[in-house]
Amino acid sequence: MPDQPHGHELVIRPLTGPDELALFRSLPYVLDHELADDLAGGLRRPEWMWVALRGDRVLARAAWWAPAPGAAPYTLDFFDLDDSLPEPERGETGVRLLETAMARLFPAGSERPEYGRFIPPDWHTDPVARDVVEARMRAVERTGARLLVERLRLEWTPGAAVAPVPGGRLAFRAVRDREELVSLMTRVAEGSLDAHTRISLASGLSPRAVSDAQYDEELAGYRSPGDWWRIAELPDGDPVGFVIPARNNYHAIIAYIGVLPGHRGHGYIDEILAEGTRILAGQDVPRIRASTDVGNVPMARAFERAGYVNFGRAVNMVWE
């Protein structure tokens, strides 16, 4: 049961309905503008949106998101604290909120969705930003989670200094079917620097199982045409890699890009990324978003060469 009110004690509860959205917005975050549409579209539910209150003052909030109406909560993407609170009150309030909400939403022993937060690109060196980020990470850690990865958020705009012009060594064609793409994804998973892929493999899943899950749970859900997806080949038809340009619920994105192990180290990533960027740019989109792990230096450099700007970062934390 949510904590019950008594005087000025802390009250922890879910929203009663969409009419309490203004209350939830009492604390700020960069995704606040998406909340109303997400609720209307079934990607959020009031019972997934929780607040910690003292009187009418919101001291902490948390919310989960689903990729499609009717789906289970997929990620904890809102977790905010009132940063005017002193420690340890600030952190303890956040911990109580998370523990209360997760006990209600996720039965004991069930998997808890990953926590993800968008953060400023300079948060390591900006004292104020660092305090905000670390306070939330500490609270999440106290509920049993750990940091999985920090990621770069990247953006290409039509005014970018680098135009998406493929180099000519590769030929591109549409993906024939699910089996062809998943087979290539399976090969790319081997030796991958991507933290999410590596943790899935470390859990005991095979590269094929990881790729099947990524296709079914992510790629198959995009609303954009599958004929945007491209296989990169050498003149003799040997596949080199692939790129998945797509639209998610909010932006045009480079959803997935990979080079097969035997072809890495030859600069093919630049041509493959240019092709994916070209396809999306041809849709007259205002921006193209992408992300990659901070530790995946080769991929980060490829995006930089292609004119993508690092406008932010993100942290992902997991419960195990």
Per-region residue spans from a language model:
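Hydrophobic adenine-recognition pocket in adenosine-nucleotide-binding enzymes
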Residues: 257-259, 292
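Acyl-donor-binding surface of acyltransferase catalytic domains
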Residues: 1-2, 90-176, 317
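Conserved active-site tyrosine of GNAT-family acetyltransferases
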Residues: 136, 140, 303, 308
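A structural microfeature
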Residues: 60, 149-150, 241, 312
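Conserved acetyl-CoA-binding loop-helix of GNAT-fold acetyltransferases
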Residues: 87-106, 259, 265-282, 297-305
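Short amphipathic alpha-helix that is part of the acyltransferase structural core
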Residues: 1-37, 165-209
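Conserved donor-binding loop and adjoining core beta-sheet/short helix segment
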Residues: 37-122, 235, 243-252, 260
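Active-site rim helix/loop that mediates acceptor-substrate recognition in acyltransferases
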Residues: 25-55, 198-234
